[in-house]
Amino acid sequence: MSNLFITNVKTILTAPGGIDLVVVKIETNEPGLYGLGCATFTQRIYAVQSAIDEYLAPFLIGKDPARIEDIWQSAAVSGYWRNGPVMNNALSGIDMALWDIKGKQAGLPVYELLGGKCRDGIALYVHTDGADEVEVEDSARAKMEEGYQYIRCQMGMYGGAGTDDLRLIANRMVKAKNIQPKRSPRTKAPGIYFDPEAYAKSIPRLFDHLRNKLGFSVELLHDAHERITPINAIHMAKALEPYQLFFLEDPVAPENTEWLKMLRQQSSTPIAMGELFVNVNEWKPLIDNKLIDYIRCHISSIGGITPAKKIAIYSELNGVRTAWHSPGDISPIGVCANMHLDLSSPNFGIQEYTPMNDALREVFPGCPEVDQGYAYVNDKPGLGIDINEALAAKFPCEGGNPTWTMARTPDGTVWRP
């Protein structure tokens, strides 16, 4: 029986990259032995902080950190109701921190505890954007020169709209020049306006241009971000077939996944789905019925490494590959959790990557190394990453509500982001 037990659980809020992050630190009775996890739900940081401080911390103190599965299962049902994104982000941070502790206890990196390496480097895809086809092409060429072989191409932010909400995206995403939205009423409610139909028609033109200019030696991806109707998603997926996308992401909203059956019958474009799911069972019918090719789990929203490894194995048995969600609004600790799973999963597909600025790398020593389109984690015990708490305190969070989620169609109707 282990003599180790949890003595303290704390949350650390910091924004060194301009994006609000939530970090969990679990301390033990062994001096210097602690674990770190990512609990970032950028849009609701204080709700997650409260869930950890007021509920999970008292629940955890005194428990053996080695009992990861038991802690996960008991914490998940301790509130009776099945968890939503707030509680699941809190639980994810706890779970990652426990795996970090277990790796440090064993003197091994987490990927060794998950079965060991299946590959030597982690292939990455990065984001490009532009106001028109030429700007997207130029941006993609720049990424290709950096060595990236997988590139996500957007023309304007999701749906062709632009935004100045820098708290979520690290750089301004311009509005597409050649998408002409329908007129709006005389008065307009606040929000980011876009035209789903005009956007859906523009994307095949974008990829026609890119394939003519860049050829087929680079893998191209696109994220619809649920900003089109299901029938338009089917039209788009079919129209994109000649351009051989690596995958089309989130063509429908989580509420409309039954449309994927019709999409699958009409198109061979590979589909990635699920960054908004918060329960691993939401993927089960999509995997069972072969409706998707890649799982887009946001590991910080589904409960951490423990459920992510299970859904990865289930996907492997059904010919589905992983593509963990990794936008700018997860901490480098969450990035490391993704990558330890990437290294140990035989059905790894691709890893999304958002470049980190110097401030992030200073606050979180041990960030993955990126070279020529591949990522490499270090071989230190645990997740291999730490936090400089004194430096983190110099980057306070802003909190508040984001504006980019307030998407509206031309007549002012609120649309899913």
Swiss-Prot record:
Gene Ontology MF, one: gluconate dehydratase activity
SMART domains hit by this protein = MR_MLE (SM00922)
Annotated site (Important for activity and substrate specificity): P327
Q: Which cofactor does it need?
A: Mg(2+)
Locate the transmembrane regions by residue number. none
Keywords, A to Z?
Answer: Lyase, Magnesium, Metal-binding
Q: Where does substrate bind?
A: Q43, H127, E275, R296, H325, D329, E352
The record's Gene3D superfamilies line, in alphabetical order, gives: Enolase-like C-terminal domain, Enolase-like, N-terminal domain
User: What EC designation does it have?
Assistant: 4.2.1.-, 4.2.1.39
- A GO BP term, please? amino acid catabolic process
- The top EC class, named as a word, is lyase
Enumerate the active-site residues: Y158, H225
Instruction: Detail which positions bind Mg(2+).
Output: D223, E249, E275
Q: Which free-text remark accompanies the cofactor?
A: Binds 1 Mg(2+) ion per subunit.
Protein task:
Has low D-gluconate dehydratase activity (in vitro), suggesting that it has no significant role in D-gluconate degradation in vivo. Has no detectable activity with a panel of 70 other acid sugars (in vitro).
> What family classification does the UniProt entry report for this protein?
Belongs to the mandelate racemase/muconate lactonizing enzyme family. GalD subfamily.
* PANTHER family assigned: D-GALACTONATE DEHYDRATASE-RELATED, STARVATION-SENSING PROTEIN RSPA
Quote the protein name from its UniProt record. Answer: D-galactonate dehydratase family member RspA
